Structures are given as structure tokens and as C-alpha cells.
Amino acid sequence: MRRLLPLAGATLLIAAAGGASGQQAGVGSIITRAMFESMLSHRGDQGCQGAFYTYDAFIKAAGDFPRFGTTGNDETRRRELAAFFGQTSHETTGGWATAPDGPFAWGYCRVNEITPSDPPYYGRGPIQLTHKYNYQLAGDALGLDLVNNPDLVSSDPVVAFRTAIWFWMTAQSPKPSCHDVITNQWTPSGDDRSSGRLPGYGMATNIINGGEECGKGYSTDNAKDRVGYYKRYCDMFRVGYGDNIACRDQKPYGGG
């Protein structure tokens, strides 16, 4: 994750109902423990840090967000989870062109940014939370002091997943949330439409890193990598890719 637009009064609404047990029946009914291990089978390999990411941590974190992976019909739910893991797998990838099992079998290899860009607020966790103001926003929403304790994101796997799902679920005006885009809860404005910003996986890429990857008239290597992971997970979940999976013709939001 490269940049978040500031939020006014960012607040995470965590429902008391539908906690971890509810998510075990919801998200866990699509991403079983066996599926999780198959999706991210190389995360614990030599050279990777990803054994840090566990299925139990994912399910526990998802329990704080009752709408995550549970909105809409079965097809929509599967596509959202494929999209979430597609984007976060790119952010944490350890893959290369000739990697065993292919380049898109190496998601969740990294916990920390390879070359820290803004110490101590460099990229951490599945969404690679970066920069002090993003740690502040996420911490305020989650009830954690991430400004003074940024390493919580790389030392507690539940916190790591919570920051990623929080980002996924949270709109950053004028950007919608990735969740609303993928679950068809977002209606593009006139400006969005004239800028080519339409519902689909490509819009999630635009939200996360549009300034660097979108609106160039061609797909960057990073954008292609995001799509490659997404397609792999859609295939594993037996769901179609949907429309507008690329963002090459989408104008990014101001400042990316």
C-alpha cells in the first residue's frame, strides 16, 4: 500500500455480533484451513517471512469485520476474498517468473518492506501499511497505538490482518472502499465514469496504488502481478473474474 488519503474521523465499526465464530462459518466456509495453506503454500519457505501469517490469525481478524467476505451472494463473496488476497499477495509477494509452482504461488512471503522507505513507518503486514499518518488512522480505528508501536503490525499476525482488512473496508473520500467496489455497493460518480473508474478489480488497484500503476494506457508489471494473483485465486474459488480487472485506462485519484 503506497498512500492513503486522510480520513476525517476515521472509525472502525466492529459489531459485537458475528465475531470469530460467525466468520468461521462465513469467510471460513470459503477459505478453509486447507484452502489457506494451498493458496499460500510457499509463505514459510526459506527466504520468506510469511510463516508469521496463520489461518487462525486471519479468521480471528476477519471476525472484527462482519461484512468482510459475507456481503452479497456466494459468487460475490468468493470474488471479494479472491480480490483481497490478490491485492495483498502482490503487496507481500516473493515470486519470480520461474518460481516453483509459478510466480503467483508466492503471496504472503514478506512481512516487512524489503527496502524501508519511511522508518519507522515502513510497509508492514498484508497491505504493507506505510507512513505515519496511515499508522495513526489505522491505530485510531482499531484502538491501538500504532504510532508509538508500529512493530505491532509485524509482530502480531492478528493485528497485521486487522490493518489489511480495515484498509480494505474503509472508504477514503473521494475513493470508495475496495469492499464496496468489489461487492457492487459502489456507484461511480460522473467524474469517476469520465475518468474510466468503473466497478471491478482494476478499481481496487486504483484505490491502493493508482498513482503508480493506473491510467498509463498499458498495464505495468506490478498491475499485471496483481491481476495474476487475482486470477489464480478466482480459479481456486471457482468464480469468474468479473469486468474491468485492469486499471490501465483508469485515471488515478489526485496524488494517487
From Swiss-Prot:
Disulphide connectivity of cysteines: C48-C109, C214-C247
Tissue: Expressed in leaves and at lower levels in roots, sheaths and meristems.
Active site residues of this protein: E91 (proton donor)
Span of the signal peptide: 1-22
Keyword Disulfide bond: yes
Pfam families in alphabetical order: Glyco_hydro_19 (PF00182)
EC number(s) reported in the record: 3.2.1.14
The keyword Hydrolase belongs to this UniProt entry's keyword annotation: yes
Swiss-Prot/TrEMBL GO biological process terms: cell wall macromolecule catabolic process; chitin catabolic process; defense response to fungus; polysaccharide catabolic process
Swiss-Prot/TrEMBL catalytic activity: Random endo-hydrolysis of N-acetyl-beta-D-glucosaminide (1->4)-beta-linkages in chitin and chitodextrins
Enzyme category, top tier: hydrolase
Cited InterPro entries: Glyco_hydro_19, Glyco_hydro_19_cat, Lysozyme-like_dom_sf
Gene Ontology molecular function, alphabetical: chitinase activity; endochitinase activity
Record key words, sorted: Carbohydrate metabolism, Disulfide bond, Glycosidase, Hydrolase, Polysaccharide degradation, Signal
Gene3D superfamilies referenced in this protein's UniProt entry, alphabetically: 1.10.530.10, Endochitinase, domain 2
PANTHER family tied to this protein: CHITINASE 11, CHITINASE-RELATED
Family: Belongs to the glycosyl hydrolase 19 family. Chitinase class II subfamily.
Protein name (record): Chitinase 11
Originating species: Oryza sativa subsp. japonica (Rice)
Gene symbol of the encoding locus: Cht11
